[in-house]
Structures are given as structure tokens and as C-alpha cells.
A protein has these predicted regions:
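Conserved beta-strand segments of alpha/beta enzyme cores
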Residues: 35, 77-79, 137-140
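Acidic, PIN/NYN-like endoribonuclease modules and their adjacent C-terminal/linker elements
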Residues: 2, 86-99, 110-144
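Acidic catalytic patch
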Residues: 16, 40-44, 66-98
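Conserved glycosyltransferase catalytic-site signature
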Residues: 7, 103-107, 124-125
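Short, well-structured N-terminal submotif of metal-dependent ribonuclease cores
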Residues: 1-38, 50-67, 132
Length: 144
């Protein structure tokens, strides 16, 4: 099983002062590191969030955060998944009642994991994964 890591898990793994740093590391060491993935959206989110001057431990440098992520992605077991799911295709959704704009990115990531018959690992317990066909099965919540 391969786990597509949510940006918040990537951040927790790299930020020693993150509230979920130790839990994310424990999970990654025991399960996640065997086969894990990033994609353009999760990589972009990691770099965007951690390089913002408002992020508590930001270096303010996109280049530095790219280096941090590049080092993380050198850990064996990493895969890069290209973005190749379209949310405008009806077969992605479990109903015509689509999600709120705030959930679209994470639901896209769930759909990406579903397409590959893998898992989306996240800290977000409020994600309406039932809106994506196969979303419940693809969701892996970290036990935090």
C-alpha cells in the first residue's frame, strides 16, 4: 500500500515544533515510509505554507523549503504521482451533491489515491470523503 501524504503530514514530518511532529514521525517510521507519495499539489502546498513569513518557523525562503522537501523525498519508498484526475468528470463523484470550495483540494487528493487504488494519509478528520467514489476506502487517518 502506498500513502499519498497530505501537506500537513509533510509539514509535521519536517517541523520539529509542529503539534503532530512526534505522532507523524511514529506513523511514518512504522507504516508510511515503506511506500509513500507526493504529488504536485502536496509539494506546492508544503513549499507555499512553510515559506510564508506568517508560518511560525518560516525561513521566508522558497528555495530553502524546496531543499527541505527535496531531502525528505530522498527517503527510500518515495514515489511522485503526477496529477491526472479531473474533478469535472462525473465518475469521480459519488453524488451530484458536490463539496464546498474549501474541501476541493483534499477531495482531489482522495480521488488521486482512489484512481491508483492506494491511500490518502491525512490529519483532517472532517474531510467529506463520502463525496468521492471509493473515498472512504482510500482514507487513512493518522491515529492522533
Amino acid at each position: 500500500m502506498t500513502y499519498l501524504l497530505d501537506a500537513n503530514i509533510l509539514i509535521a514530518l519536517c517541523d520539529e515544533l509542529h503539534a503532530h511532529h512526534h505522532d507523524a514521525h511514529r506513523w511514518f517510521k512504522s507504516i508510511g515510509r515503506l511506500s509513500w507519495a507526493t504529488c504536485p499539489l502536496t509539494e506546492n502546498a508544503f513549499i507555499r505554507i512553510t515559506s510564508k513569513p506568517t508560518y511560525p518557523r518560516s525561513t521566508g525562503s522558497v528555495t530553502e523549503q524546496m531543499r527541505v522537501l527535496r531531502e525528505l523525498c530522498q527517503i527510500p519508498g518515495h514515489q511522485f504521482w503526477p496529477d491526472d484526475v479531473s474533478l469535472v468528470r462525473h465518475e469521480v463523484w459519488s453524488s451530484s451533491d458536490h463539496a464546498s470550495p474549501a474541501d476541493l483540494t483534499d477531495l482531489y487528493l482522495v480521488a488521486l489515491a482512489v484512481k491508483r487504488e492506494q491511500k490518502f494519509a491525512t490529519l483532517d478528520r472532517t474531510l467529506p470523503v463520502h463525496r468521492i467514489r471509493g473515498g472512504q476506502e482510500a482514507l487513512h487517518l493518522l491515529g492522533i
